A protein has these predicted regions:
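Active-site metal-binding loops of divalent metal-dependent hydrolases
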Residues: 68
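N-terminal glycine-rich FAD/FM-binding segment characteristic of electron-transfer flavoproteins
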Residues: 65
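Signature for the C-terminal beta-barrel architecture of outer-membrane proteins
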Residues: 1-4, 12-46, 51-61, 90-206
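Surface-exposed extracellular loop regions of Gram-negative outer-membrane beta-barrel proteins
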Residues: 71-89
Length: 206
């Protein structure tokens, strides 16, 4: 097997369209997701983004189809990532942002895939998202209910050696997550907001 692989492609079309693709695998994972004939198609993340859409009195900063990341309340209320990151209050790249963005990062267990948007004007801003994606989880042997979500590295059902695990953990759970946030802006730099999200699963959690 080759070592860790991570490939990214980002393309823009005019002022509005942006296409993002990424393929990532850890050491020990299979290279491809499925085959078309003899062609191996790798597991990939993708997003198609339309930017700067003006509709009525709203400016839609981003409308995203595919994989996206979402952050609400500096990550205190909601943030999807496989990696711990402390709250930051720095400038430029070190500042945690608010909203939804195309996602071609290495995050896979908590990756979101679906539809998301972010819009606003001088008085308020709003964001919303809907995601449906598979999750890795530890299942109870007795009834196949979910004991816990798990971040697998590498993501495989194989145990030590060539034997498979007693219960599969890779993509054993389907999750639907939806949510959003609206923030009023009475003064520049001052926000009064309401945020909510909900996650639903196709297996009981015990």
């Amino acid at each position: 097997h080759p070592g860790d692989l991570h490939h990214k492609i980002v393309a823009t079309f005019g002022k509005h369209w942006k296409l993002s693709l990424a393929s990532h695998r850890q050491l020990g994972e299979k290279v491809y997701d499925f085959k078309i004939g003899d062609f191996e198609v790798p597991t990939a993340k993708y997003s198609l983004t339309y930017r700067d859409l003006k509709l009525g009195g709203l400016k839609f900063d981003r409308v995203i189809l595919g994989n996206f990341s979402a952050t609400i309340g500096q990550g205190v209320i909601f943030e999807n990532t496989d990696f711990f990151s402390p709250r930051r209050s720095g400038y430029s790249w070190s500042r945690r942002v608010h909203g939804v963005f195309p996602d071609i990062s290495r995050t896979r267990e908590y990756a979101l895939k679906g539809l998301a948007f972010q819009a606003g004007n001088k008085l308020f801003d709003v964001m919303g998202f809907l995601s449906k994606n598979k999750r890795d989880a530890i299942l109870n042997i007795s009834d196949s209910s979910v004991a816990s979500l798990i971040t697998l590295y590498p993501r495989t059902n194989n145990g030590f050696g060539v034997e498979s695990l007693l219960m599969p953990m890779l993509e054993t759970l389907e999750e639907v997550t939806y949510g959003g946030s609206i923030r009023l802006i009475p003064l520049y730099g001052t926000f009064i907001g309401f945020s909510a999200y909900e996650s639903l699963y196709d297996k009981p959690l015990r």
